[in-house]
Amino acid sequence: MAESREHTFTGTRGRNTVRAWPHDRPRYVAVLVHGYGEHIGRYEYVADRLVRHGAAVYGPDHMGHGRSDGDRVHIEDFEDVVTDVRSVVEHARAEHPGVPVVVIGHSMGGLISTRYAQRHGDDLTALVLSGPVIGEWEVLTTLLAYDEPPHTPIDPATLSRDPVVGTAYAEDPLVWHGPFKRPTLEALATTLAEIAKNGRLGALPTLWVHGADDALVPLAGSRTGIEATKGTNLTERIYPGGRHEVFNETNKDEVLDDVTTFIDRALPRL
């Protein structure tokens, strides 16, 4: 695997940890935006593939996640998380001036990345969304019906057909295994509405990848968000039998081949 290093910065709500996988002469910068309850350390394989493809890779642990400060999984405003991701992008651009930037967001990270593209699309050469929480998410509606969300942990089997992935997730001390926090659910609802209100992504090359059998963020609900935000340059790849984490699926190399092929098309020709 590619070597990595960590640094911290002062984010909107405290100290945030960032992992970087360096490249001496990158063709592009990739910023990985992780999902709910997890951390950027779960993206080692993805980062390694991207480094070998010519990227300098960066990824923050969001507030309340992984090694970053904050009450666990407590997010009151996702606009703050978008601002933190912008800080990572600016750091990467300072280290690699003039190099194209690609943002890759998974699940809740897809929501954050979509909102980033709406706010700062001029920063980006391409956007990749994996199982994104955009559009209609029935899980959110169900959980918001409770005054206190029930303690219903994510079933590791819903992540991937590879049982090793589920076992590692269940045993990972940096993964949150408790209930959703109500402020986080309310912030998710607010941001879904904000994304719907702010419209399409214009000409930004966008790749949407999704598992057809995703039970956590079902395909049909995300499609409503994709249809509402897609611009003039959308590519979609739906993987039969795939579950929520297509980057950790049994066909992950196929998925990452699709990602790198898409990035090659999106990068400016020298």
Language-model region placement:
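Short beta-strand/loop motif that positions the catalytic acidic residue
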Residues: G202, W208-H210, D214
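Conserved alpha/beta-hydrolase
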Residues: I40, A47-G70
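N-terminal cap/lid segment of alpha/beta-hydrolase-fold proteins
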Residues: M1-H23
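Active-site nucleophile loop of the alpha/beta-hydrolase fold
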Residues: V128-W137
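Catalytic nucleophile-loop/oxyanion-hole region of alpha/beta-hydrolase
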Residues: G37-H39, G66-H96, V255
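Short alpha-helix in the alpha/beta-hydrolase fold that links the catalytic acid
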Residues: P218-E227
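Catalytic active-site module of serine/aspartate enzymes centered on a nucleophile-bearing elbow/loop
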Residues: N233-L270
